[in-house]
């Protein structure tokens, strides 16, 4: 086991949009921190999405704190644009990042946390922020007969390009943005059906010349409980609804059973299928927190606005609807990270320094008094 003798202020688990946004705030306050991620480079799960994935918010509303998204502010960036932006962001602010480090366990010892990785490394910090987000564990619903299916079955996280399905009969499962976007592009090369449990809810991408996200920001509607409780609509310039209206895309109520060569619809009819693609979302992967009381029997994270209910010093950034509708988005993680900072700093004051006298003598700038002086000097 490679255990570092260095005691950090904060360990950030996750090097995607949430972890980098938090890193910027930690840096502004002069804290000693390290971002850990299982991937080699910053960018998080954006590296794993399908090639044509396009943001549903324009670049001007898709930036992390301290650095605008490059290019036309009215454009809608693609997946590779986001990856490049996140890499550039980490480099611009020289955020301390350690890749190829998959966290497998977090335990709390007295005033500090011990974070253990699969590669044998162990880190110690006074606080831990879980920023691995909500998109780390693909979710596929349990459907009778699914395991018997002989065709291609994959989650949208494994989908890349439509060419691989040319000439095939494909059913895409899901009613949100990714499902509709994937089905729409597949329809150019394949026979496609959308299977949904409820009707697809469309919302115009632009209203009176302004993007949907501009209205959310200006009206502050995204901060209301009402919007956070709503299912996510499909943002549409008109092409998706038109594709359904003209028959280019077809929607059917969710199938009830899977057969080796197809599916069974609610009316009992069968449909032969070559491929099933599940755009059914993700779940947070919090297995490394199994030693801490952070979840209930329903799988919900025990936190309020990013602060763990029962574990002092443990925080979250990037969970869906953590504080509002935007919490799991590029534009939302920065504000949520900023919200945590005064709470995290108060925790630092309560626990004091975890360094030994010998460590403080070697590096006096990392002592508590030095840190708090740094907090006062840096902007928030």
Where are these regions (language model features)?
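Flavin (primarily FAD) cofactor-binding/catalytic cores of flavoenzymes
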Residues: 2-15, 21-39, 43-45, 74-363, ...
């Amino acid at each position: 086991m490679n255990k570092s003798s260095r005691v950090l202020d904060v360990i950030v688990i996750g090097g995607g949009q949430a972890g980098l946004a938090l890193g910027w705030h930690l840096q502004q306050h002069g804290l000693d921190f390290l971002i850990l991620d299982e991937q080699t480079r910053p960018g998080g799960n954006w590296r794993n999405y399908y090639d044509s994935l396009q943001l549903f918010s324009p670049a001007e509303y898709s930036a992390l704190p301290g650095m605008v998204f490059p290019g036309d502010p009215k454009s809608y960036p693609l997946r590779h644009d986001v990856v490049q932006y996140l890499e550039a962001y980490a480099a611009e602010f020289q955020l301390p990042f350690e890749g190829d480090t998959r966290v497998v366990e977090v335990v709390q010892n007295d005033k500090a946390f011990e974070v253990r990785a699969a590669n044998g490394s162990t880190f110690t910090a006074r606080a831990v922020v879980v920023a691995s987000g909500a998109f780390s564990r693909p979710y596929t619903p349990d459907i009778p007969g699914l395991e018997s299916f002989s065709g291609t079955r994959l989650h949208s996280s494994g989908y890349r390009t439509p060419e691989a399905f040319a000439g095939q009969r494909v059913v895409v499962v899901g009613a949100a943005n990714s499902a509709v976007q994937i089905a729409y592009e597949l329809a150019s090369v394949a026979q496609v059906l959308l299977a949904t449990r409820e009707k697809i809810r469309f919302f115009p991408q632009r209203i009176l010349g302004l993007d949907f996200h501009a209205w959310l920001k200006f009206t502050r509607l995204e901060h209301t409980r009402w919007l956070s409780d709503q299912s996510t609509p499909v943002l549409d310039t008109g092409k998706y609804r038109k594709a359904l209206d003209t028959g280019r895309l077809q929607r059917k109520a969710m199938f009830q059973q899977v057969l080796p060569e197809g599916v069974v619809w609610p009316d009992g009819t069968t449909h032969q299928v070559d491929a099933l693609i599940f755009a059914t979302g993700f779940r947070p992967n919090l297995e490394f927190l199994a030693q801490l009381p952070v979840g209930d029997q329903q799988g919900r994270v025990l936190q309020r606005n990013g602060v763990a209910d029962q574990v002092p010093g443990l925080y979250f950034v990037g969970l869906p609807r953590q504080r509002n509708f935007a919490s799991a988005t590029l534009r939302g993680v920065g504000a949520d990270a900023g919200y945590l900072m005064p709470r995290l700093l108060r925790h630092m004051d309560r626990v004091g320094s975890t360094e030994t006298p010998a460590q403080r003598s070697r590096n006096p700038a990392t002592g508590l008094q030095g840190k708090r002086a740094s907090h006062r000097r840096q902007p928030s």
